[in-house]
């Protein structure tokens, strides 16, 4: 009989959590979600009238978010001019992942991630910045996060 081992993502040990930069985080607290949830709500409120009804926190709604970011990029504004918009749209994508998978927001030193139940960390705010640079997709990030560990 062989002994089953678990990898790091299967552990529920609260003392051995590190973020993507290698720093140890405290166990998640509900307050870690406060800012991203607010940023997501602000992004939905600021969305064009034709788009707002479609931002229903469903995975398909992220297609529209990707298109919004693509349109921003085509307009050519400097990053600093759209940084808060991108933060809000990334937070919206994170909220979609949270609602679809039962994930939790994690935060440390001003950075925010989503931790899915399988233990993986996702960076939707960074993915929104990559989308603006032409190298990412919030829709695909959500697809990968909701598929679970393979």
Where are these regions (language model features)?
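Acidic, serine/threonine-rich, charge-biased low-complexity segments
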Residues: 1-7, 48-52, 71, 139, ...
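N-terminal intrinsically disordered, low-complexity segments enriched in P/E/S/T
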Residues: 3, 21-54
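Long, intrinsically disordered low-complexity tandem-repeat segments
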Residues: 6-24
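Intrinsic-disorder-associated interaction segments
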Residues: 29, 33, 37, 54, ...
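Exposed alpha-helical structural elements
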Residues: 35, 39-42, 60, 64-67, ...
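An N-terminal amphipathic alpha-helical segment
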Residues: 46-74
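Amphipathic, interaction-prone secondary-structure segments
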Residues: 76-119
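A recognition module on extended beta-rich or small alphabeta surfaces enriched in W/G with H and D/E
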Residues: 114-150
